[in-house]
Amino acid sequence: MKLVLFNDYRLGVLQNGNVVDVMASLDGLHFHKPQEMVEGVILGWDQVKPKIEQEIQGKEGVPISDVTLRAPIPRPPKLICAAVNYLEFGQRKPAILDAFLKAPTAIISTGETCELPPVPASIFHHEPELAFVIGKTATKVNQKDALSHVFGYFNFLDMSARGLQGAVGNSFFLGKCWDS
């Protein structure tokens, strides 16, 4: 099932190129902000999923081209990114895994304008990435159990201000964590 947030942060299901509004299936879920709605859906998935499945039966929805897609996780409480672009630098073996935190305020929706920071970057670069949504508390998880913590996934663009990392050692913060 492909969940989307669209227009004024309404929950929908993408099927056959159309978006079906499923807000009615969230009856009883209390939230004030889109992020709270998303968290409620994830945490209550076992109860919400059957309601959504029933809601989409026989509904055509509207073409995806007629809606404005929003960020699927509007303000993630934690966004951890892996810094392992070894293929980009011509290395044959993966580099040692490094990670960095990205600010939730760096998240924008499809079609929104990414504001470039006023820094002396050598180039601003977008990198397509795969994001995993962790759906339950995950601390010291064994590799064999890791996927049981994944609620879903989506693609995103990681924006980088290249040429700044060397100025502060090997930190990715200055090059990747600007508000947008």
Which ranges hold each PLM region?
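N-terminal non-catalytic cap/leader segment that marks the start of a structured domain
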Residues: M1-L97
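Glycine-enriched loop-and-adjacent helix/strand subsegments that border the catalytic/binding cleft
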Residues: R70, P76-S180
